Regions:
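Active-site glycine-rich loop that binds ribose-phosphate moieties when present
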Residues: 126-139, 167-170
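A glycine-rich beta-to-alpha transition motif near the start of alpha/beta enzyme domains, typified by
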Residues: 4-120, 152-285
Length: 285
């Protein structure tokens, strides 16, 4: 069943989650299929809607033998690439919906299959393997794709807290070679004990977010690839990454050809749930 606004209003049940400050509206779309990018944009509006960095739809995926399919749309309402923190929230939401009673879940997203694990209030998901030949190291930045494209800038002397992430990120986002497709821009500071601080400008949100899961993973891999952390270490466990929204941990295995066994772990919280009555007049605001 596809929801179409043919009446004065419709009722939409929703769940608001956050993963290290990256917040999302989650919708159970297994029976009622919701496909309306303008609606999604309105729902994500922090002044006239519920407010969120993006929308996550949980859909049936029986054909591909996974527990569910995760469809992700940015706050601009458009379907986007993989969202790491969104994936962690989707795993927690799927458990709440009763899709599984176990603390392990198998799901599919735009970039392929993922496994998710729930341990108390922490949720971990495995991420795609990264072919080291696809990582582009330039004199001033590193580019790689961890399910979403990321531009990594390492800060040496600069104070990351004073960085104007919005202005600088926006300027890089559409620059050559990215143009209209854009890129996520990460500013990274290496601290003691191989700890990272990361701030991210996200395309589609068109602003800095409190945390970006794929950006955190990309930052750790870029730091490993440029030998800024864990030089000559094969199995890398629980690299701590500090974001504005909290702490995340990244683990991975580094081989000659690729980074594999990549996992992203952090907190997930159901903030609230409710129902919104969507009036046609509201959509036309």
């Amino acid at each position: 069943m596809k929801i179409i606004l043919t009446s004065l209003y419709m009722k939409l049940d929703f769940y608001k989650y956050q993963g290290t400050g990256n917040d999302f509206i989650l919708l159970d779309s297994r029976k009622k299929k919701v496909e309306n990018s303008f609606l999604f944009k309105k729902l994500c509006d922090r002044h006239f809607g519920i407010g969120a960095d993006g929308i996550i739809l949980i859909q049936n995926d029986d054909k591909y033998k996974s527990d569910f399919y995760m469809k992700y749309c940015n706050s601009d309402g458009k379907e986007s690439t993989m969202c790491g923190n969104g994936g962690r929230c989707a795993v927690s939401f799927a458990k709440k919906l009763g899709i599984t009673k176990k603390n392990k879940i198998h799901f599919r997203a735009i970039d392929g299959y993922h496994n998710g694990f729930i341990i108390d209030n922490l949720v971990s998901i495995n991420m795609m393997n990264i072919d080291r030949n696809t990582i582009k190291i330039h004199s001033k930045y590193v580019f790689l794709n961890t399910g979403s494209p990321h531009h990594i800038l390492f800060l040496e002397e600069e104070n990351i807290k004073e960085k104007n992430v919005y202005e600088e990120g926006k300027n890089i986002r559409f620059q050559n070679p990215y143009f209209e497709k854009g890129v996520n821009v990460n500013f990274v500071k290496i601290l003691e004990n191989d700890t990272l601080q990361v701030r991210t400008y996200e395309r589609g949100v068109e602003n800095e977010t409190l945390s970006c899961g794929t950006g955190v993973v990309a930052s750790v891999i870029a730091a490993c690839e440029t030998n800024k952390i864990k030089n000559n270490v094969k199995d890398i466990k629980d690299i701590l990454v500090q974001t504005l929204g909290g702490k995340l941990w990244v683990s991975l295995t580094k081989t000659k050809k690729e980074y594999k066994n990549v996992s992203l772990t952090g907190n997930v919280q159901l903030i609230f749930e409710g129902s919104i009555f969507i009036d046609k007049d509201w959509l036309n605001l």
